[in-house]
Amino acid sequence: MIGNQPNVNNLDVNLEELVLPVSLLADEELSPDGDPEEEEHYPYTIDTCCKPCGAGVRFTIIATPSAVITLRQLLLQEVFLTCLRCSRSLFRHGRS
């Protein structure tokens, strides 16, 4: 400020020093704070039934708890398993 009484005309502001260079923002990248924490993998046994005949189907997986939740949702809604007998009769061991 210049003068005894402050007013807008007395402001001595150099705005060029406050403006960031364009390349600083355009080329800016955020560095990761660290590796994301990896979830532990655990063994799970899944009991379900064969869609065509209703026989019991059991299998074991090693997965994270969140993956097991996703698999559970798939098995309850969209994905159906078959037993070995139905698989052989439906797909004839991969032969057409």
Curated annotation (Swiss-Prot):
Gene3D superfamilies: 3.30.160.330
Gene Ontology biological process terms, A to Z: DNA-templated transcription; symbiont-mediated perturbation of host cell cycle G1/S transition checkpoint; symbiont-mediated suppression of host innate immune response; symbiont-mediated suppression of host type I interferon-mediated signaling pathway
Residue segments, region E7 terminal domain: 1-42
InterPro entries the record matches: Papilloma_E7
Keyword Cell membrane included in the entry's annotation: no
GO CC terms of this entry: host cell cytoplasm; host cell nucleus
Main location: host cell
Recorded GO MF terms: DNA binding; DNA-binding transcription factor activity; protein domain specific binding; zinc ion binding
Keyword terms, alphabetized: Activator, DNA-binding, Early protein, G1/S host cell cycle checkpoint dysregulation by virus, Host cytoplasm, Host nucleus, Host-virus interaction, Inhibition of host innate immune response by virus, Inhibition of host interferon signaling pathway by virus, Interferon antiviral system evasion, Metal-binding, Modulation of host cell cycle by virus, Oncogene, Transcription, Transcription regulation, Viral immunoevasion, Zinc, Zinc-finger
Zinc finger (unnamed): 50-86
Subcellular location: Host cytoplasm; Host nucleus
Top-level taxon of the source organism: Viruses
Residue span of motif Nuclear export signal: 68-76
Entry comment on modification after translation: Highly phosphorylated.
Pfam families the record matches: E7
UniProt comment concerning the protein's domains: The E7 terminal domain is an intrinsically disordered domain, whose flexibility and conformational transitions confer target adaptability to the oncoprotein. It allows adaptation to a variety of protein targets and exposes the PEST degradation sequence that regulates its turnover in the cell.
Role of this protein: Plays a role in viral genome replication by driving entry of quiescent cells into the cell cycle. Stimulation of progression from G1 to S phase allows the virus to efficiently use the cellular DNA replicating machinery to achieve viral genome replication. E7 protein has both transforming and trans-activating activities. Induces the disassembly of the E2F1 transcription factor from RB1, with subsequent transcriptional activation of E2F1-regulated S-phase genes. Interferes with host histone deacetylation mediated by HDAC1 and HDAC2, leading to transcription activation.
Family as reported in the entry's similarity comment: Belongs to the papillomaviridae E7 protein family.
Subunit and partners: Homodimer. Homooligomer. Interacts with host RB1; this interaction induces dissociation of RB1-E2F1 complex thereby disrupting RB1 activity. Interacts with host EP300; this interaction represses EP300 transcriptional activity. Interacts with protein E2; this interaction inhibits E7 oncogenic activity. Interacts with host TMEM173/STING; this interaction impairs the ability of TMEM173/STING to sense cytosolic DNA and promote the production of type I interferon (IFN-alpha and IFN-beta).
Name this protein carries in UniProt: Protein E7
Organism placement in taxonomy: Viruses, Monodnaviria, Shotokuvirae, Cossaviricota, Papovaviricetes
Gene name of the encoded protein: E7
